[in-house]
Amino acid sequence: MINLKLIETNFDEFNKKLIAKNVKNDVLSTLLEAYDELKKDRLELENLQNLQNTKSKEFGEIMRQKGDAGELKKELSINKSKIQTQSEIVKAAEIKLDKIASCVPNIIDDDVPFGADENENVCIKKILQPPVFDFQPKEHFELGEKLGWLDFERGVKLSGSRFTAIKGMGAKLNLAIINYMIDFNQSRGFELVNLPFLVKDEILFGTGQLPKFKDDLYKVDNDELSLYLIPTSEVTATNFYNGEILSEDELPVKFTSYSHCFRKEAGSAGKDTRGMIRQHQFEKVELVSITKPEDSDKMFDEMVSCASDLLKSLGLAHRQMMLCSGDLGFSAAKTIDLEVWLPGQNTYREISSISNCRDFQARRAKIRYKDKNGKNRLVNTLNGSSLAVGRTLVAIMENYQQKDGSIKIPKVLEEYL
């Protein structure tokens, strides 16, 4: 969640940044009104508690002197009832504030360009030149069906739309891609973690998926358990230290994690209906870092380089895009997307998103560290795909396709097959 004390002293600046993130103009005002109400209620409770303490001392002194404390006893009883009532008022004010604050997105960094949507994202640089073909390149779904790698019809038969069956050499290549990504990320100092695919509500709250994006999540709900399927292993890797206080010496934490991801893709009707670009179930290899606040910018650059170098090692042309304010995710203060060239579509498509969430997720998940002076401080959290597995398979198929419809295997993957 956002820092309410900081917002209070920089209202106009932060309100402008939230509006740039397509948040309604009155949201921040409503949030601060609820915050002021809570502070007022807490002050009233504190005053009543102080009065109770003072009166209790007076009562004790009178009793020691064996005096008449009848009236004072009545006052203490009345004030105790007031404290109970005021405590309930404070609790209700806290719930009201949390409900509002939990749906307010992170504040954008100063260097994030203002813009309405993805059309106003800014290209930072392009890496490698797209391949030139002496024939009309095909899209991955046409190549995959012809080779017997991708079976969309049976994927639909098994699970419905936006599910794909991968088989034969396609499945082997998919597995090779995963193992290569994990090895590459480990070579950059990221520790491999294997984490659950089902999580509790509070874990999704920690990374910002709940409560705002509940409709895009799959839930397993029965008599035995009530858990959500993860939309990304960012959720589990970031929350690994949920509610904990780390020592400064433990930072930075650098995780890489492979997982299946599950998303309803609400609002994407009609988009990418053919092929593997947009699926309800897909695979990713994720990077997650937990750092001191002063180190997160350097870590952000390191994570962007890791994912970009991974694409480069596969010989895949791509570009780095700075997301504008209107295209940023809920928890992100800053994001760079990596978009890979797909010759079959004759365009660049997102294959990785690297985000710095500052202390936004840490505040929600209560992840802190104890600094050298013994003070507990919030960490910064960062996450990014390195890479989306299915889209990497798509990119290899389209970029390495031959005139006869066969697919050449990138050299770095040969030992993994």
Swiss-Prot record:
Catalysis: reaction(s): tRNA(Ser) + L-serine + ATP = L-seryl-tRNA(Ser) + AMP + diphosphate + H(+); tRNA(Sec) + L-serine + ATP = L-seryl-tRNA(Sec) + AMP + diphosphate + H(+)
Residues holding L-serine: T232, S233, E234, E286, S385
Gene Ontology CC terms, in alphabetical order: cytoplasm
Recorded metabolic or biological pathway in which this protein acts: Aminoacyl-tRNA biosynthesis; selenocysteinyl-tRNA(Sec) biosynthesis; L-seryl-tRNA(Sec) from L-serine and tRNA(Sec): step 1/1
Chief place of localization: cytoplasm
E.C. numbers: 6.1.1.11
Keyword list, A-Z: Aminoacyl-tRNA synthetase, ATP-binding, Cytoplasm, Ligase, Nucleotide-binding, Protein biosynthesis
A single MF term (Gene Ontology): ATP binding
Binding site residues for ATP: R263, K264, E265, E350, I351, S352, S353
Subunit structure: Homodimer. The tRNA molecule binds across the dimer.
Family designation: Belongs to the class-II aminoacyl-tRNA synthetase family. Type-1 seryl-tRNA synthetase subfamily.
Function: Catalyzes the attachment of serine to tRNA(Ser). Is also able to aminoacylate tRNA(Sec) with serine, to form the misacylated tRNA L-seryl-tRNA(Sec), which will be further converted into selenocysteinyl-tRNA(Sec).
Domain notes: Consists of two distinct domains, a catalytic core and a N-terminal extension that is involved in tRNA binding.
Name this protein carries in UniProt: Serine--tRNA ligase
Protein's organism: Campylobacter hominis (strain ATCC BAA-381 / DSM 21671 / CCUG 45161 / LMG 19568 / NCTC 13146 / CH001A)
